């Protein structure tokens, strides 16, 4: 009986092995059914095999030394390590103006193109854009480096860009207590500046016997606009009563009878600039600085006798009294500067040209408030837009030379007029005012379609500086 269970067991085993469905299959066939990723260091000692990037730094966190084993080159390892350790700092594109970004460990470096600087190459280090960031003057020390400087009476701030007063009453700065809290400047937003390599000498004289045809319309981009911020004072015909001390560089020229006939601007303690057609050598002229109300004693006036009248060397009244219409007046005694008697700033040639052509200007004087009307008693002030040369030439049959420019309103109603000649046309940058023009002539006053014509000061900068010994 004991043999029966044993025989039965063998029979069952044979039946199981002969079944159609088998449990075990060949190794190669099994690999197609079940697979797993083998580690880079499977079954071998890591120290005995060459470096593997997957094994060292992807499956596990690696050290710099382990990464170095993979690349076997320090420079390539560094490039990998900068991104591996803290991500690519250049992904956010921090570099500006076409600069190339180079990633670093927790940092980045911008490789700036020529003419740009700063951490992100955001600073245009040339004078072409935004005047090189300079508050006053910009010049090129090297072809791609802008160097800032300041007008007389100012010093360059530690930032190398802004200008701070170095004297109590620097040029072009309004300091009268009556002007505190009053906005008188235009917000300068000039983007592009045209600075030449040699921003110095005066322009060449023009031939008077050549009639200049209007140039063809230009297709270049229009100059950047400056949005003016002006005061809302009581309106006078064409202008406004100024605030006392608002125009401390304004001079009133009076004759031997004490009657005013022209204006002028203070250059320094001994010199005033005006229009050449206003007077002739030998005239008895008194320059009154600090004037405000011509019918009252303002207690701020300083009267000086004019001892020398110097028109521009090539000025010829007989041929054309408005060509090179600018003159310098030497005073018998120096003026004493204060909040009501302050010089106007004189910029370089290119600086003055850029400032002039990119925004509205401010004109002032005691001239007629209507064509052939009575003169103003209180000093008048008016903001007028600069007029492009094509429009200027089309407005008149009279020759407009390059020493002249137009300013005013096409609709008329606002303009300089008789008695304002010789007075200042000024533009501001920041809180500093610069002389950019001298009131010269016009066809009637404030007539629609006509503009005031001014002498372009930029042409005469070198002559003014040399004659007045202005530093």
Swiss-Prot record:
Residues bearing attached sugar chains per UniProt: 92
Domain EGF-like, residue spans: 86-122, 123-164
Annotated CDD domains: EGF_CA (cd00054), Tryp_SPc (cd00190)
Post-translational modification: Activated by factor XIa, which excises the activation peptide. The propeptide can also be removed by snake venom protease. Activated by coagulation factor VIIa-tissue factor (F7-F3) complex in calcium-dependent manner.
GO biological process, one term: blood coagulation
Disulfide bonds listed in the record: 57-62, 90-101, 95-110, 112-121, 127-138, 134-148, 150-163, 171-345, 262-278, 392-406, 417-445
A GO molecular-function descriptor: serine-type endopeptidase activity
InterPro entries for the chain: Coagulation_fac-like_Gla_dom, EGF-like_Ca-bd_dom, EGF-like_dom, EGF-type_Asp/Asn_hydroxyl_site, EGF_Ca-bd_CS, GLA-like_dom_SF, GLA_domain, Pept_S1A_FX
Subcellular location: Secreted
Superkingdom to which the source organism belongs: Eukaryota
Main location: secreted
Residues annotated as binding Ca(2+) 8: 291, 293, 296, 301
Active site: 277, 325, 421
Summary of subunit composition and partner proteins: Heterodimer of a light chain and a heavy chain; disulfide-linked.
Protein name: Coagulation factor IX
Organism of provenance: Gallus gallus
Phylogenetic lineage: Eukaryota, Metazoa, Chordata, Craniata, Vertebrata
Gene designation: F9
């Amino acid at each position: 009986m004991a043999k029966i269970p044993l025989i039965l067991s063998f029979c069952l085993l044979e039946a199981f092995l002969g079944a159609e469905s088998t449990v075990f299959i060949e190794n190669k066939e099994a690999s197609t059914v079940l697979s797993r990723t083998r580690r880079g260091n499977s079954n071998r000692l890591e120290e005995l095999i060459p470096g593997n990037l997957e094994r060292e730094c992807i499956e596990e966190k690696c050290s710099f030394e382990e990464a170095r084993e993979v690349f076997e080159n320090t420079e390539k390892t560094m490039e990998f390590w900068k991104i591996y350790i803290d991500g690519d700092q250049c992904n956010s594109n921090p570099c500006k103006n076409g600069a190339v970004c180079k990633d670093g460990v927790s940092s980045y470096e911008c490789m700036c193109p020529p003419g740009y600087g700063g951490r992100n190459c955001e600073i245009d280090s040339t004078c072409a854009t935004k005047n090189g960031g300079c508050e006053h003057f910009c010049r090129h020390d090297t072809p791609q480096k802008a160097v800032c400087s300041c007008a007389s009476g100012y010093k360059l701030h530690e930032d190398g860009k802004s200008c701070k007063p170095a004297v109590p009453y620097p040029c072009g700065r309004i300091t009268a207590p009556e002007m505190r809290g009053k906005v008188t400047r235009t917000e300068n937003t000039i983007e592009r500046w045209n600075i030449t390599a040699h921003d110095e000498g005066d322009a060449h004289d023009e031939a008077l016997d050549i009639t200049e045809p209007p140039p063809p319309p230009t297709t270049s981009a229009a100059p950047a606009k400056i949005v003016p911020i002006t005061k809302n004072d009581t309106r006078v015909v064409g202008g406004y009563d100024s605030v006392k001390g608002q125009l401390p560089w304004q001079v009133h020229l009076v004759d031997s009878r004490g009657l005013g006939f022209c204006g002028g601007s203070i250059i320094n303690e001994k010199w005033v600039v005006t229009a050449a057609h206003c007077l002739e050598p030998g005239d008895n002229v008194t320059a009154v600085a600090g004037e405000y109300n011509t019918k009252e004693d303002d207690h701020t006036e300083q009267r000086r006798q004019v001892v020398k009248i110097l028109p521009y060397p090539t000025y010829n009244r007989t041929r054309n009294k408005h060509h090179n219409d600018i003159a310098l007046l030497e005073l018998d005694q120096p003026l004493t500067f204060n909040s009501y008697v302050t010089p106007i700033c004189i910029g370089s040639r290119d600086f003055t040209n850029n400032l002039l052509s990119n925004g509205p200007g401010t004109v002032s004087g005691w001239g007629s408030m209507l064509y052939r009307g009575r003169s103003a008693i209180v000093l008048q002030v008016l903001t007028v837009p600069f007029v492009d040369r094509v429009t200027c030439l089309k407005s008149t049959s009279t020759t407009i030379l390059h020493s002249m420019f137009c300013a005013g309103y096409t609709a008329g109603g606002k303009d300089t007029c008789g008695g304002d000649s010789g007075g200042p046309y000024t533009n501001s940058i920041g809180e500093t005012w610069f002389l950019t023009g001298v009131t010269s002539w016009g066809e009637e006053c404030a007539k629609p379609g006509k503009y005031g014509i001014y002498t372009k000061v930029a042409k005469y900068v070198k002559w003014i500086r040399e004659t007045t010994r202005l530093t």
